[in-house]
């Protein structure tokens, strides 16, 4: 079920009503009905769409609450300064789960997300469970039907479980099994968060991955080169971040809190090798769970990641 954006979420400190250099995002955001959006001849600006769904988390035996994530992130983002002076910033609202099967909600989200991807230079998709990634892939493939897609996931988990239905832990297996013209790179894998069968599947499918342990102090030149080579080798990049990759000291409000997780600045450093590329079709950020957040710490962290990713 799709609902348009809620203006009441977008509030913040008012420094000026006339000087754009003092504006914050709540002063520049607009709202549109994404279901009625016509294709633009020239993509521009930024589109935001929420995936207010945690059904996949529940099916994956995780702790629920991430369906409230998109609104919490938008509220935190609203008060940040508009340093980029975006020519267009549109909150398209959220998609909610009201179907019998999760896959039907994913397909509904994908149809709408594809419109934003086709119409904007940047599209941010806010979760919600990490089953958003499969929906993001469907949207990407709709916009780019023949191009090679490189999927980059900053995550503690492979999320390549073999299940009978979509869950927050199956997205990337679904992608790899359905589409031979995709490859998968995972940054931040937790050795204690993935079974041997998942490592075996990664070997079988030639999934490139980097352990979290290799990223705790710095991002080495070897890893930077790996990312840049992966970006170079693909026509389109689908970029996604699962917030459970970040240590719970910084991100307590997630579906599965991390022990020995990454520092936020490490995630930013990794993203610097990805975001500047014009190949990035969209960015999704998943598993922000307000139910377990402290002082809105995790919502603010996601909001600041989006803020840093604006270009």
Swiss-Prot record:
Pathway involvement of the protein, from the record: Amino-acid degradation; L-histidine degradation into L-glutamate; L-glutamate from N-formimidoyl-L-glutamate (hydrolase route): step 1/1
Gene Ontology BP terms: L-histidine catabolic process to glutamate and formamide; L-histidine catabolic process to glutamate and formate; putrescine biosynthetic process from arginine, via agmatine
Cofactor remark from the record: Binds 2 manganese ions per subunit.
Reactions performed catalytically: N-formimidoyl-L-glutamate + H2O = formamide + L-glutamate
Gene3D superfamilies linked: Ureohydrolase domain
Binding site for Mn(2+) 2: 155, 157, 242, 244
Enzyme Commission number, as recorded: 3.5.3.8
Keywords for this protein: Histidine metabolism, Hydrolase, Manganese, Metal-binding
GO molecular function, one term: manganese ion binding
Tagged with keyword Plastid: no
Necessary cofactors: Mn(2+)
InterPro entries from the UniProt entry: HutG, Ureohydrolase, Ureohydrolase_dom_sf
Positions annotated to bind Mn(2+) 1: 130, 155, 159, 242
Pfam family, one: Arginase
Family: Belongs to the arginase family.
Role description: Catalyzes the conversion of N-formimidoyl-L-glutamate to L-glutamate and formamide.
Entry-linked PANTHER family: ARGINASE/AGMATINASE, FORMIMIDOYLGLUTAMASE
HAMAP family hit by this protein: Formimidoylglutam (MF_00737)
Protein name: Formimidoylglutamase
The organism of origin for this protein: Staphylococcus aureus (strain NCTC 8325 / PS 47)
Gene that this polypeptide is encoded by: hutG
